[in-house]
Amino acid sequence: MNLGMSSAILSKLPRVGLALLLGSNLGMALLFANPHSAMAGVITLPDGGRCEGELSEGKLSGSGICQYANGDRYEGQFINGKPHGQGIYTFKEEGRYQGEFALGEFNGKGVREFANGNRYEGTFKNGEFDGTGTFTSTNGIRYEGSFTNGSPSGRGAFTFSNGTRCEGDIKEGKVNGKGVCQYANKNRYEGELLNNLPHGPGIYTFAEGGRYEGQFSEGQFHGKGVREYPNGNRYEGEFVKGNTQGQGLFTFKEGGRYQGPFDNGEFSGEGVREFANGNSYKGTFVKGKMSGKGVYVFKNGDRCEGEFSDGQFNGKGTCIYANGDRYQGEFLNGQKHGQGSYLYADGTKVEGNWQQGQLQK
């Protein structure tokens, strides 16, 4: 084809297609165009990339496509040679972005899909997640809320792969501050969090009943607190890494209580146990049971002092009875057993060997 083709044919062609029809370079195309009007053309970038689309004053303005030298690709709107408006940017190896652009950056609403399967949908500012959005990762973590400079910040909620959902104040990409966590087992926490875990004062409510209110550390009961159990029992005192540890008061629903030291959830050390029937024990406990030196007082006034083991009066001891009688000797499982002497209130005294509470003749 040559420039001698009929003027009638040329007059029917749109101006935006003239450069491509003539097969000329961009400079020749501009000879036939209004320098301030849009026309179609091709631009070769300094690094070898190639762009084509609507041109104005030698720059892409309007719809266009750029294939960059690094393998990335953009298709969408341009202003003054930069992506601006709606478009799709496809990375050679890092997924793609679809949404709004401003002056060459992701700006406004959009969707960023990563090659590893991670996905963000929301608002962008200068190429970063910024504003409100949702980030979903392939490892099962989902975040909905506010972002600043590419990271979760402000108010938001994390949903983890195990079903736990925590929402609240977001700092440094995690829930740090006041928040609420709903767990997969239907348990619930409300209070202070650090790095998505209960930390500081808070309340933990169990789905099956009962609750804990007090101090937490790295997701565990730690410090002073109150634990109410579903069976009605109650503990108030110190906790260490989730267990009752240190000084505390344990109250039983049916009556009675224990006050003293705990070790790994059990009565341990010098404490006082008051029973629902009115009896009481003051002395040493080991693994939750009376064991060691102690004094056991019955509701009726009987009093036994001596050695205990496995929750029973075992070993040497003395019992002073409410009627004035007195026994001193050996015991087994709470009964007189072994050598002992029995002094009656009237002064009568018997000594001998006892078996299961009975004097042997």
Regions found by a protein language model. Name each.
Residues 3-24:
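Bacterial N-terminal signal peptides that target proteins for export
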Residues 102, 115, 123, 132-138, ...:
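Ala/Thr-enriched low-complexity intrinsically disordered regions
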Residues 23-37:
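C-terminal segment of classical bacterial N-terminal signal peptides
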Residues 37-57:
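Short N-terminal segments immediately surrounding and downstream of signal-peptide cleavage
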Residues 1, 44, 65, 88-90, ...:
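Threonine-centered tandem repeat motifs in low-complexity domains
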Residues 51-60, 73-84, 96-107, 120-129, ...:
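Conserved anchor residues at repeat-unit boundaries in beta-strand-based tandem repeats, strongest
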